[in-house]
Amino acid sequence: MITMINNKTFNRKTTGTLKKLVLSSDKSLRRSFNGASSTKDFVFSESSKVEEWWESARFKNISRPYSATDVVKHRGSLPANTSIYPSSYQARKLFNLLEENFKNGTPLHTLGVIDPVQMSQLARCRNIKVAYISGWACSSTLVGSTNEVSPDFGDYPYDTVPNQVERIFKAQQLHDRKAFLEASIKGSTPVDYLKPIIADADMGHGGPTTVMKVAKLFAEKGAAGIHLEDQMVGGKRCGHLSGAVLVPTATHLMRLISTRFQWDIMGTENLVIARTDSCNGKLLSSSSDPRDHEFIRGIIRDNVVPWSEKLIEMEDKKIPNSAIADMEKEWYHENELFTFEEALEKQFTASEFESYKEKKEDLMVNKLGRAYLSLREMKLLAQEVTPLKKIIFDWDAPRTKEGYYMFNGCIEAAIRRSLVFAPYSDMIWLETKTPDLEQARSFSRKIHKQLPATKLVYNLSPSFNWSAHGFDDKALKSFVWDLAKEGFTLQLVSLAGLHSDGVSFWELANSFQSDGMKAYVEKVQKREKETNCDIMTHQLWSGAEYVDSLMKVVQNGASSQTLSTSGESFTETQF
């Protein structure tokens, strides 16, 4: 029994010890900063540490357009090691898994989860090493601050997915503590509940500072890695919907740099995946980046009234929407779209076009040393070939009401963008519209020809009708492993949790309406028992024994009447 005197003694001793610890900590922090002869010396010292960090194996293939000093100057006076983020530990775990699997040509494949239940079942699968959280799933099932669920248009509050990450990560930690306690008592090996989380950051939800805030949130909430796609804020769509608007290559590159810069300031090692939707994208927000010019489409008729002008005129005249829709189809039917080089091929002779291609290759390889030409440069080159021939090409006339350009989404566009993004990211994600192994193989080999260490990501999307693409059972089973051999190390079924949740509950509900508890027992309890699903004893699954153990410590063992997992009321002894 603890007396009041002992309490006072304990409190005096504890208070004194804590005071010494605080003062000691405060002095060490002041020494770390004030011990240097000046702020500049402190910055120089910390910058050297950052440079050494960047030289580690973790960042051997990462480029940065800024210096270590830029990072340190934006950290403040507290040394970076005063803040420790668990997500950075998880990121190192993820990095090592990726390195190992990329080296071996094996997949790091996983399923998207939508709640702690699914996370816990995923964790029990030894050969699934990571977890995934989808923005689509969050948008349609869990928008915490507004509860406005909707399709995946990226228009939910930007803390939506980070908050789901926090929810899943905290659940991982609870189940890890529960499993660790059990293993410490039984001497067994605990389940690894701390699978690194990879999360959907959409398009970053804004400009550079917004992207930095989003990246910071993900690191604080527990995500080991995130992916960012090259779509426009306000024009984002699910990668398997039409109408997505791409941003210029430079804009997305800025997002990747902003993300890395934020994590460098925090001193974390989280991973960023650069996703490109340019394989299927049909719209581009701006023509500002010359690297995109080769893929912008225009018309080859002269003196055509631009579609946007015709549209405004019709709207002013109150023409019905249905008539406007018909006119739009007619306008684009009459004005076929071409890239500049397709336009040249139409207007040049075969020999002229061949001469143009030879001159272009020579200019890019031998003189400019880059893989692209701007529209201005392509026009000048065309004039060199045929000085007297007028080349008609107008990429402004077909622009949409919002001002978007027509874009020729194709595998070549995806390759070009990916080669730009790769040095500033940890992985490259190719978003596709079909599960096509040959397309993936072609993409991989062209990327690896120039950047052999680039790890790739593949979305094994539920949006594909997998049964309609000619797979037999053998090919379907080997698809993941065949992709991994081509460097697609990370593979995920993004909405697996959502679909499995829907179909299992639909089967139960559909039967329950007529069969009552017979349906529940057959479709749930029997299946839980047959498959060794630990949700069957949901009280134990939720951590009731762990909490009882806490109570025993706090109450000095005098808790036999208040424990939740003993006594007649504890019904899980029936199983």
Curated annotation (Swiss-Prot):
Induction context: Repressed by glucose and induced by ethanol and threonine.
Alphabetized UniProt keyword annotations: Lyase, Mitochondrion
Active site residues per record: C238
EC top class named in words: lyase
Pfam families (alphabetical): ICL (PF00463)
Chemical reaction(s) catalysed: (2S,3R)-3-hydroxybutane-1,2,3-tricarboxylate = pyruvate + succinate
Pathway annotation from the record: Organic acid metabolism; propanoate degradation
GO terms for MF: isocitrate lyase activity; methylisocitrate lyase activity
Function noted in UniProt: Catalyzes the formation of pyruvate and succinate from 2-methylisocitrate during the metabolism of endogenous propionyl-CoA. Does not act on isocitrate.
Additional notes on this entry: Present with 1084 molecules/cell in log phase SD medium.
Protein name: Mitochondrial 2-methylisocitrate lyase ICL2
Gene name of the record: ICL2
